[in-house]
Amino acid sequence: MEHTYQYSWIIPFVPLPIPIKIGMGLLLFPMATKNLRRMWAFPNILLLSIVMIFSVDLSIQQINRSSIYQYVWSWTINNDFSFEFGYFIDSLTSIMSILITTVGIFVLIYXDNYMSHDQGYLRFFAYMSLFNTSMLGLLTXSNLIQIYXFWELVGMCSYLLIGFWFTXPAAANACQKAFVTNRICDFGLSLXILRXYWITGXFEFQDLFEIFNNLIYNNEVHFLFVTLCASLLFAGAVAKSAQFPLHVWLPDAMEGPTPISALIHAATMVAAGIFLVPRLLPLFIVIPYIMNLISLIGIITVLLGATLALAQKDIKRGLAYSTMSQLGYMMLALGMGSYRAALFHLITHAYSKALLFLGSGSIIHSMEAIVGYSPDKSQNMVFMGGLRKHVPITQIAFLVGTLSLCGIPPLACFWSKDEILSDSWLYSPIFAIIAWSTAGLTASYXFRIYLLTFEGHXNIHFQNYSXKKXSSXYSIKLWGKEEQKMINRNFRLFPLLTMNNNEKPYRIGGNVKKVALITITNFGYKKAFSYPHESDNTMLFPMLILVLFTLFVGAIAIPFNQEGIHFDILSKLLTPSINLLHQNSNDFEDWYQFLTNATFSVSIASFGIFTAFLLYKPFYSSLQNLNLLNSFAKRGPKRIFLDKIIYLIYDWSYNRGYIDTFYSISLTKGIRGLAELTHFFDRRVIDGITNGVXITSFFVGEGIKYVGG
């Protein structure tokens, strides 16, 4: 056991040789390195697998005998100051290492095929390896200085990966947006680290917590000052984990390749923000105002992320807002003091969301066979539909991930989300009502994505791409604002379906299946397909393994008997655990209470699924569905008012709550206006004074010269 801990310092450095060797190869042997580029995936996966095995061994040691191991080296700068750096291994480090390495391995396997035709293949694997190194270094850091250094490396790698296709203006803007947004909170984090050192004189976690707590209990430091210090430390996690109001970078981060999106949303970037809070929880827990702030930010993010996901057309942006909402659940649990539930949901959500993102990548990959490389089309759910029969394996995997996200038993997210929802009643009834209601919204937007993508007919074959309507009288339009003969425009839920307001829908006959499909050949592809096609095996394999994780990872929190003592693997792994809502950590709630809460949560999720099915199932598959819509449209005289309300909600959701617009007007344009004003003042006033003095001196001198001459 001691051997395992002694060599734990190598964890962050194992993947590091890959980017170094790729860089040296491109510098010294550029042609050979590029020609043999596919060989770099194997060592990348191999080295990360070694770290995974090491992490599993550490976790087994933690289960058998929970302990904290810290080793530091002292670097004495002078007699008054010495800096210590080292590594810190506890249960949080071991479980997060397993999470990051497993998801990272699956993403690397997937990306080998996904990025095989991209000219930036080598750059992709170099960045990914550096990303994993940075995240593993963040986990094993023993003090706040090391945390900050690896924190910045994680931010830098996310900047490089989000802007991977930097020649596209959208990707360049997205990576700049992520960088600037995170710099705001990173500045707050750096201030808080300095303030914490000024108060305690220590950077090491254990010394910092002990001194900080003693100062507060003995009233030796001003309470407002320590509250400000803790707030600045928490601010670092707000942007990194996409919490309100600094969540705006997360949807735009979808401009990067899909494997990058999977890694950022499941195991690295956003997980770093969540990781920081439990790492510093012994410091936050003695300041009730900070815990209340954390829970408040969490519940706002939960609701905002779910509502903004309801109307997104881009499949990856919809999943991005889903991630934002689920991160809000984790932050809510941490603010409530439910340490175990928060980390459990981080684990289950990571595997489920990685599965969904890799599934969306498979969908995009199949759509590109028809529309070519065009993210506006290949990622747009308006052009999808009916993919179930074309990509059946992807459909099954995506359905499993969707059901898990909805909280359907026995899938992974059911166990963790149900625990958070149950604890929320003990903390605040208002927060509980919002959290439970959002669980229904989660099921609704998740199944909306599934239904629009896999059910119905492939809409891509019933439209052309020039923004002009096809000559066929059978064009399928799920979105439309103008009246047609077969659908009552006054149906009160119709505005919710409006996504393309400039095009008229066409009437559908009963012989839709007789329509000739269109082969598209004008998007730069030498070979075109009439139908989307399933991805290659190297892309399907990691998805199927993630399906197994999604099915069975929830079992680590199921309690069982061992010699008359109730315990579960997760509690053993997270010992010592902090839970303010359950002071007796060994007493588990009885099965009756569990079944009651589970039945209620599943009922809410089922209602959300039913709502999505009612609104987004393939309406045009039969005339009965159309008659059903018209029957709904005849209800009551208030339907026009309800239509307006629903349309306003939809418009607000589709436009991201106008938060990005507000930031663009108030901050971006304001700063540019200030810069232009400063430039004008500098050129016209400062330079004008200088030039005016010189010109005046010149003419005065010339005048004196003339008079004197």
Swiss-Prot record:
Family annotation (InterPro entries): NADH_UbQ_OxRdtase_chlpt_su5_C, NADHpl_OxRdtase_5_subgr, ND/Mrp_TM, NU5C-like, Proton_antipo_N
Record keywords: Chloroplast, Membrane, NAD, NADP, Plastid, Plastoquinone, Quinone, Thylakoid, Translocase, Transmembrane, Transmembrane helix, Transport
Pfam entry (one): Proton_antipo_M
Protein origin, superkingdom: Eukaryota
Record-annotated disulphide pairs: none
Gene3D superfamilies hit by this protein: 1.20.5.2700
Any one annotated GO CC term: chloroplast thylakoid membrane
Membrane topology: Multi-pass membrane protein
Keyword Plastid: yes
MF (Gene Ontology): NADH dehydrogenase (ubiquinone) activity; quinone binding
EC number: 7.1.1.-
Segments passing through the bilayer: 9-29, 40-60, 89-109, 125-145, 147-167, 219-239, 257-277, 280-300, 327-347, 354-374, 396-416, 425-445, 540-560, 594-614
Intracellular or extracellular location(s): Plastid, Chloroplast thylakoid membrane
Regions annotated as coiled coil: none
Catalytic activity: a plastoquinone + NADH + (n+1) H(+)(in) = a plastoquinol + NAD(+) + n H(+)(out); a plastoquinone + NADPH + (n+1) H(+)(in) = a plastoquinol + NADP(+) + n H(+)(out)
Oligomer status and interactors: NDH is composed of at least 16 different subunits, 5 of which are encoded in the nucleus.
Known role: NDH shuttles electrons from NAD(P)H:plastoquinone, via FMN and iron-sulfur (Fe-S) centers, to quinones in the photosynthetic chain and possibly in a chloroplast respiratory chain. The immediate electron acceptor for the enzyme in this species is believed to be plastoquinone. Couples the redox reaction to proton translocation, and thus conserves the redox energy in a proton gradient.
Similarity comment text for this entry: Belongs to the complex I subunit 5 family.
This protein's name: NAD(P)H-quinone oxidoreductase subunit 5, chloroplastic
Lineage: Eukaryota, Viridiplantae, Streptophyta, Embryophyta, Tracheophyta
Gene from which the chain derives: ndhF
